[in-house]
């Protein structure tokens, strides 16, 4: 098993050097630059997995034509997934989804009013035929992981990275459980 995994990793490294089997890009779009701190974990996660990431500010209400144009040309510009974060009325993900067949992941951003519930409802309640996959309020890290999983459907190297990440999480939980059991034994 380890030999097989090692061989696959070597093949992925060679393939990436040749430009073979490269994942598509992920667009991370925010409705306002004030949303940037919420998106930092997603940007770091995507870049950490070697996924080319383009980050932009675009408003569903202030720059609707630019948002529509970006979304309409996203596929031909090499994008595979769009992540959209917005607070309050939070129509950005829906506007982007209306103009593309690419998967759109919405991140409702917590604002000072209603603790992000308004953004959650605006992002998740989409009409039939215009789906937006919605993560938790301020759930940027999960949005990045979901985007990576979508791209991994056609990228075995990325799938390996995701498997490695899940193994690391599993090992982390096992270590925490071990430490807990030691504390319980001392009671």
Labelled PLM ranges:
Residues 70-108:
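Glycine-rich phosphate-binding loop
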Residues 151-187:
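Glycine-rich phosphate/pyrophosphate-binding loop and the adjoining helix
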Residues 24-62:
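Glycine-rich phosphate/diphosphate-binding loop of Rossmann-like nucleotide-binding domains
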Residues 42-43, 68-71, 98, 115-127:
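Active-site-proximal loop->helix
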Residues 113-160:
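Short, glycine-/small-residue-rich phosphate/pyrophosphate-handling segment
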Residues 35-40, 63-67, 86-95, 114-117, ...:
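Short glycine/serine/threonine-rich phosphate/pyrophosphate-binding segments
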Residues 55-76:
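N-terminal beta-loop-helix "entrance" segment that forms/cooperates
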Residues 1-15:
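Single conserved hydrophobic/aromatic residue that forms the stacking wall/gate
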């Amino acid at each position: 098993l380890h030999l097989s995994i090692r061989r696959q990793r070597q093949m992925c490294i060679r393939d990436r050097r040749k430009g073979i089997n490269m994942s598509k890009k992920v667009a991370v779009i925010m409705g306002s630059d004030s949303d940037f701190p919420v998106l930092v974990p997603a940007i770091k996660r995507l870049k950490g997995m070697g996924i080319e990431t383009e980050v932009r500010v675009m408003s569903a209400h202030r720059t609707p034509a630019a948002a529509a144009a970006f979304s309409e040309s996203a596929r031909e510009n090499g994008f595979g997934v769009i992540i959209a974060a917005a607070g309050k009325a939070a129509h950005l993900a829906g506007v982007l989804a209306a103009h593309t067949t690419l998967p759109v992941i919405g991140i409702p951003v917590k604002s000072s009013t209603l603790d992000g519930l308004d953004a959650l409802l605006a992002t998740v309640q989409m009409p039939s035929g215009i789906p937006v996959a919605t993560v938790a309020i301020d759930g940027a890290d999960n949005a990045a992981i979901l985007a990576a999983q979508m791209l991994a459907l056609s990228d075995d190297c990325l799938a390996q990275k995701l498997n490695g990440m899940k193994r690391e999480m599993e090992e982390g939980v096992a270590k925490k459980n071990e430490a807990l059991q030691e504390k319980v034994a001392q009671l």
